[in-house]
Amino acid sequence: MAGTSHAVTNTPCQDSCLAQVNLTASGLPILSIFVADGAGSASNGGDGAEIAVEASAQLLADKIKSKEFTLNDELAVELVSHVREQLYALAEEQGLLARDFACTYLGVLATSFGTLVMQIGDGGIVIDVGAGLEVPIVPMSGEYANMTHFVTDEDAISVLITQCYPCKAEKVSVFSD
């Protein structure tokens, strides 16, 4: 849904999201939610957001086929790395810069045995893992006002913040700004 600033400036919504429940190789349901918000300053930010959520869902679908699948920080890094590879390859293919596909990136993966939360940039995640609602990761801002971090930034992996819980999420909300 386009926000009020999109309506005023007559620009399309550049956000993308995906929420689904799949089964792991052992038959365990896994909830996956991915949200990306294309940078307004990026010429193809909306496309970047769309690719980010699609690439994440694709890699996750492959990962959950393994009996050794686990929710951990390494999985978050692998997801972000895969998204970056896809965006950088598309930029090169189109003769553009990866920055042209800049977007924020948020994700939640939840099973009955654990929950993984990950974020680069602004937007927000609110979860309840049994102790009431909480914001597990403070939304990021950049060095100056109205700045944030993007999955295409050179330091994206180092600014990625993750939070792992050893229990299932009772309630989840993931949203862009």
Residue ranges and their predicted role:
Residues 1-176:
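PP2C/PPM-type serine/threonine phosphatase catalytic domain
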